[in-house]
Amino acid sequence: MADLEGGTALSLDRHLGASDTAEAIESYTEIEIPESLRDNLVLFLRMERKVLKEYDPAVCALFDRLFNSMIRANEGNPGTVAADEPTDAQGIPTADTEGARAFREAVELIDALPVDQAQVVVRAFASFFHLANLSEENYRVETLRELERNVSMESAVDTSNELVVAYGHLLDEVGPERTAELLGRLEFHPVFTAHPTEARRKAVEGKIRRIAALLDEHPYLGGSALLENERHMLQEIDALVRTSPTELKKPTPLEEADTIIDIFDNTLFDTVPQVYRRFDDWVLGEDAGSVPPVCPAFFRPGSWIGSDRDGNPNVTAKVSRRVAAKYFAHMVAKLAQECRNIGRNLTLESRYTAPSEELMNLWSHLVEMSETLTGRVADDLGFEPHRAVMLVMAARLEGTVARNADIMYLSPEELLADLRTVQDSLARAGAARAAYGPVQTLIWQVETFGFHMVEMEFRQHSLVHERALADIRSHGVLGKLDPMTREVLDTFRAIGAIQKRYGQKMARRYIVSFTKSARHMADVYELAELAFSHAQDVPELDVIPLFEQLEDLENCVTVLDGMLQLPAVQRRLAQTGRRME
């Protein structure tokens, strides 16, 4: 490493060589590093230094010196300060040891830098840490692939797939019928938030994603292909260092929704059905893709973005409506695109894949709905009927985005019914691999994401509800109410509007933070009823208590017992088959 003051570190007049880089990384971690992980860390450290030196040799020198101090500060205790090591009020170690001295040197160096220069150095480290994380992720993926390669096709269980392992245990313990029942009830519900510590620009995400793809290819390349790979990687790393990690202004809740959409487009939409498919591939074996699937659509993503208003005045009823509309439009457009892609490739001639009577009835229904849409593909009907139907279904989905009342799908269930008609027709005609291949993948995507993409979870503080009810009791629903009270009522009206327009699943969860009694649950149901003039307009809600303090957790059983006695909760339990969160 470099030492600006002429210490014992490496000189500045040359780049860090591969062997020096490897030694530095090994010293830094002080743990045994797998060779492939070390190679990637070496590669990225060399590239980071090359980019920094091209940008400004002085910045590269500062990076070297701080990196060197970081390594020495972690000697003997990688990654943290020892629990019994004395520190000052700022957490800086005060002991007279090599590691403590290195730590203090790094702090003093950073404190002495001008703000602009400190920002550049911090950005350099931030970009390198992104690259280090990519190295670890790449190694984890390679490890999982190696585990899969070691699984014998003769094995009863795929030991690399936790879902398959659990399924195998259930078969042994409770038998096939009970296992099928439990599998049908499986649900995985991750929730996306807009926590500041998780904020990352889409521009940065895109660069990291492209570097990850290049790193994945790197070990398999040679010659000019390898040179081009590394040139492209350097280009992306250079751009990463020069790109601000944060937006110029704080994103609005509507802009934060783009984070979910980006994750959806680049990961969830394609990856989730692949998870289902991998389970089916092992459980069904050679029959996979030619018989009805076993794996249910168990993934149910949720989101607090655009709906969590506890302490966030920027999330209003109007914002929630706009975020819901954004999710809906993107989701249905994505389904339309996928439906059209499948339709274009469903070129199965009718003389080899005869359409079922139900498929022809569906076509007749589509003709009655719109001769314009069906007229565009009418010539295909006698030749490739399944293709013709799927293309019209795609056009209906496009009409759904445009809110064309004449042709739009009113619900994802209506779309699923049409897809299953196509699937059943293909299967009966002997084209099982088309039925349970691409068409089944689209069915899984509709079952998983519906038209809503994510289930919005509304959250508000229990005290806000108490104050709103007190205000209403004093002035009446139509009286002069406090702005926050009006916003609370508008929130329930927004939930009702979202449910009517986009389906109940998009906005049925309502979380009460700092729940201290069953009364706080009752407050939500009461406010929901007060927000509407007609009882039939009141939305269905799954009100969920959030216990955030130790005292509340200790009292949670009493609160839940009281909650179960509420008439609104009993009514909701009757609708959900006695299930609640």
Describe each PLM feature range.
Residues A2-H475, M484, L541:
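Often metal-dependent polyanion-binding catalytic scaffolds in large enzymes
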Residues V291-P292, S307, V315, D424, ...:
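Conserved alpha/beta-domain cores
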